[in-house]
Amino acid sequence: MARRGRVQLRRIEDKASRQVRFSKRRAGLFKKAFELALLCDVEVALLVFSPVGKLYEYSSSSIEGTYDRYQQFAGARRDLNEGSTSINSDENASIHSRLRDITAWSLQNNADESDANQLEKLEKLLTNALRDTKSKKMLAKQNGEGSRSRANSSGSRGQEEGSA
């Protein structure tokens, strides 16, 4: 049995062919949305605007209710991000301050002429600053991944339909 080749993704130039393809793909997308809602017991809302601006919509419940839920989720996520941004800016200011102190200390105490004790002190400061930076980086990565996984599991479903 012959396999079909991959469909090359590019704009279809012929207007009639483009309209036929749009209709078929739209029907397939709506069928998938229905199946997803039915099989997985999830809330799905799908809005599609045709090239001429006609609206096609599907919702497993109500579009308005789903949109309201999305707005609440997006608002809570935005508030969370704004709160973490202010915390991060305070932490960044602290790190920059420590870095300025270390730089000033190393300039004052010319590292080439320093004794072993002074160099050990500088090494300890730099090691601590590096450790703190790495831990903050790890925490930021974990928070970023956590918010993405929460977004995928708690109701943000627009990304999955758009990427299909």
UniProtKB/Swiss-Prot annotation:
CDD domains: MADS_MEF2_like (cd00265). Plant over-expressing MADS50 have an early flowering phenotype under short day (SD) conditions. This is MADS-box transcription factor 51. It is found in: Nucleus. It comes from Oryza sativa subsp. japonica. Residues 133-164 are annotated as: Disordered. Widely expressed. Disruption phenotype: Late flowering under short day (SD) conditions. Disulfide bonds: none annotated. One of its GO terms (cellular component) is nucleus. Keywords: DNA-binding, Flowering, Nucleus, Transcription, Transcription regulation. One of its GO terms (molecular function) is RNA polymerase II cis-regulatory region sequence-specific DNA binding. InterPro entries: MADS-box/MEF2_TF, MEF2-like_N, TF_MADSbox, TF_MADSbox_sf. The keyword Nucleus applies. Pfam families: SRF-TF (PF00319). Residues 2-62 form the MADS-box domain. The gene is MADS51. Probable transcription factor involved in the regulation of flowering time under short day (SD) conditions. Functions as a promoter of flowering under SD conditions, upstream of EHD1, HD3A and MADS14, but downstream of GIGANTEA (GI). May transmit a SD promotion signal from GI to EHD1. Functions independently of MADS50 to control flowering time.
